[in-house]
Amino acid sequence: MQGFAVKLTTPTSVDIAITKKCNHRCIHCYNVWRNDDANQDVLKVLTDEQIDIITNELVKNNVWRATLTGGEPLSELSVLYKLIQAFGSKGISLGMNTNLSLMTDDIARTLTEEYHWDNILLTSLPGLTAEICDKVTQISGSYERIVRGIDICKKYGIPVGINIVISKENMYQLENLYEFLEKHTVSYVSITRAIAPLYDRDNPAFFLSENEIIHIADILETVHRRFGVSVGSVTPFPLCILKNISKYQDIVSASCAAGISRCSIDAVTGDISACTHEERVYGNIYSTGLKNAWDNMYEWREGLLVNDECKECRYLSFCGGECRMIAGTESHVKYNLNRNADIQYTPYSPIEPVDKQTKFRVSHHVRYRREPFGGVLRCEDNECYVSESIILIYEHIMKREIVSVSDFLEICEESEYLYNAIIELEKMKILRRIH
């Protein structure tokens, strides 16, 4: 599909399942092997050689960020600490997905004091009451242990995000989220639609209606406005369902990155997929390498897996379409993906104009790399694909503390394009205006 997505030569981010062990048995879990007690992979522990191979592959392919997941990463502490040390020494930024039920004071102290961990931990919170949480995890006492883990992280200054995976089993209790947030401090709230796992494809509990999806968006919008925390969803919201983009502008900024800028690595077996929910394997990091697998998943970047309802939609390049895994599993979809939907959008407040007297402070928390189309710039959580000329402009000012338009005129003629490029760098928070 022409123009569907940028064609990165390698991913900028990866999810790495560092173990197959998990102390929960969530009914929505995408890991098909976790119900197979005979699967010997559950018992395997990563070797130092495997850790070295993964680290070298990420460095060689210029991967910026790795999210450590599982299984439950806190169930393999020695491996977890080795990976944090190895990746950190190579400048790879880290995130972690954990249910936090195994978090202790000792672990939190080790993370912060020995490994200087200050990145967000995204924890799965399957229910907002003990009854529902324990029902979803199928483990008695899981809710109390998760909440205890959240509070321990707060005690040691570790930022926590919560991800609530929603099906019809726990949809009705979302209103309890407000009370939960009044008692427990978090930095991020995600509400994610459950995807029917491979072993339970036809379970109607996983198929949400259009009104239920809109209700999720309304809850997130209220959380952002009331508590001032960042909000989002692991699976994207189709714009033709939300319709009012202006109302939900804080949750529609991210479309699916699987196979476009991100992929998933099973560190135990080495298998590489585009998405953690996907059954297909595109390569193996130990035998054929990351680059080979990335090249093999071209169909994700070409838009070949986009569902038919989204392919001809004029908003596809902005929306990204429905989650590929949901679109591929919901044979009884309860909502209508409508390419002719009336999308309502009021642009963000305009940025102040730039003139020759305008000065900016330059962020030094920027990663960038060149690509055939230009390059990728990342500042904080903003990752943008830009032209070669913007890369050149950034390289000219990247080591400076403060710049003005006159600094840009050293390499560019004054033009509308230059001023627009400066504004783009400001939107990415690479430049911050000095008033």
Language-model features: locations:
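Flexible mid-to-C-terminal extensions adjoining Fe-S/redox cofactors in radical SAM and related proteins
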Residues: 1-8, 272, 276-374, 421-432
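Conserved alpha-helical substructure of the radical SAM core
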Residues: 1-119
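Long, charge-rich, low-complexity alpha-helical segments
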Residues: 12, 383-435
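Residues immediately within or flanking Cys/His clusters that coordinate Zn2+
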Residues: 15, 19, 23, 253, ...
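Aromatic/hydrophobic pocket-lining residues that form the small-molecule binding cavity
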Residues: 47, 51, 80, 146, ...
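Radical SAM enzyme [4Fe-4S]-AdoMet core and its adjacent flexible, acidic
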Residues: 124-126, 131-258, 262-268, 272-273, ...
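Short, ordered coil/turn segments that flank beta-strands lining enzyme active or ligand-binding pockets
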Residues: 267-268, 380, 427
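Short alpha-helical segments that sit at the start of domains
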Residues: 364-392
